[in-house]
Amino acid sequence: MHSVETFNLPALNSLLETTARRFGNRLAVQDDNGSLTFADFVEKVGILSAKLRLVIKRGEHVAVQLPRGINYIVAAYAIWEAGGVYLPLDNQWPSSRIEGILHRSHVRVLIHTSQADQGLELTELPAETRAESPVAGTPAYIIHTSGTTGEPKGVVVSHESLIHLVESHQRDIYQAYDVTEGPVAINASFCFDSALERMALVALGYSLHVVSDQVRKSPYELVKYLRDNSIVNVDLVPSHLKVLLSAGLNEKCDALRLVIVGGEAIDAELWREIVQNQAIYINVYGPTENTINTSFCEIRGETPHIGRPFKNVTCLLLNENGERCAAGEEGELLVAGRHLAQGYYNAPDLTDRVFVHIDGIRYYRTGDRVRQNEQGNLLYLGRIDDQVKINGFRIELADVQHNLTQLPGVKYAAVTPIKLPTGQGLLASIVWNSDAPEQTFSNLEALLGEKLPSYMVPTRWQKLDALPLTDNLKLDHKSLLSHWKNSQEQIGEKFAAESISATEHQIKNLWQKILRQPSLSPDAHFFASGGDSMAAMTLLVELKKVTPQDVSLGDIFKYPTIRKMAAWLDASSVQAES
């Protein structure tokens, strides 16, 4: 314990107190377990903040590992009020990853759920020497993203940058499109940077509904939730939005006026589908290193783009020679301005490498290839490196590759991005060590899942005698993809003539379409065949169209093969008729 410091409240906390004085009895936050008015919310924040002030000093890191709900938001505001730095953790992450982040980030206190009464509990962690912030300014939070070394890197963002982002959204989006009140929803993971923008809406007086994990994973339940709670504004990644549109998002949610779409690129097909809807859809783009969002646009017209920068953001395009791009020339996007993050925690070399000074201005090198069209909008063209995005999460291929090569029996490994109907996926190509027994791909998947979050684990696997190289002796990703495609066609020929029932045939066709597999055995396992959470949600939507049986996400786990699911559906149909 130490003497309690005094200091001015961060801007968001000051806004929250002003809002609470104006709208004390108005709903502030709600989840499946209850709700809090603004008066109650501020009181709960104050109680937790007082406890934190007794054990932390200003600028110390406080990690939050809680079930999804109101308490995550309470914890963030309490940490800021106490002068701490908010560091969210995901309960779904492997324990080794969480322990590594706690250690490398020099976390002082962990906020978690009490086993005794399910309330909030503070656990002090061993005190260690803490690195200074990368640049001057008071840090607000640290968000971890995939790193090239096999360990996640922590992006440090200041209170100043966060409040500038909040002001940009309020001015350029919510006020500009006249969506300044009404219930709003947070769909993003609390470990995803866009969750901070959602959480900030509470300070601005919006009533924030926290969508539960169960509802988030069921397209029809989520659409029903948005409809029943008259949600006017929600955040979605494109791959999730695609599934929800198929589940009737536009037709069933009359109150929905504004959808914030971000986290990954929107393809032309989805863009055209969005244009036909009644609600306003805003495409937001930006790296975590520029405080969530850099540019935005309303989704309309024929060609996908990422719009123009917010008013307090500066963009610069450089070609391969490091020169400013001519009009219409593609190049790497660099961003500067008031949204810019402080850098990476305890990684000065990496910070200096990507946060650069040009003509006296500090820029972040995004690694994104863009081009500016004649209308002044930025067109996203891809990456200049090996970074990909899956369901909105950034993944460095080197991170996955490094962890793969640490697994028993693996001599060499390559990870290649692969386009799937549900979005981006990963293909793992493995060369076995001849001196060690071979592992099954299921075993490797399980072992990798102990080190990495599920969204970083490849869903496609293949065994090779050697990794193919180009003439320049670089890894040949095209050959890896070609080899995998050819092997899948051979599997398809093997099972094409297999005798199956009518229901099995129907399900088989759905699986092949969703998983983009030429053919599947009746005993093929949905998740072992490349299925992931987004593919499972797509399957729920497609099954709803062809069967009267209510199918949940749990049913896909319970009946994970074509044969088992068909037998269950047939048995359920017989029971319904009798």
From Swiss-Prot:
Residues bearing PTM O-(pantetheine 4'-phosphoryl)serine = S533
Q: Which GO terms describe its molecular function?
A: phosphopantetheine binding
Which cofactors is this protein said to need?
A: pantetheine 4'-phosphate
Gene3D superfamilies under this entry? 3.30.300.30, ACP-like, N-terminal domain of ligase-like
Q: Which sequence ranges form a coiled-coil region, renumbered to this chain?
A: none
Q: In which pathway does it act?
A: Antibiotic biosynthesis
> One cellular component GO annotation, for this chain's record?
cytoplasm
Q: What does UniProt list as this organism's lineage? A: Bacteria, Pseudomonadati, Pseudomonadota, Gammaproteobacteria, Enterobacterales
Any idea what this protein is called? Dapdiamide synthesis protein DdaD
Alphabetized UniProt keyword annotations? Antibiotic biosynthesis, Phosphopantetheine, Phosphoprotein
- Stored PANTHER family: FATTY ACID SYNTHASE, NONRIBOSOMAL PEPTIDE SYNTHETASE
Stored SMART domains: PKS_PP (SM00823)
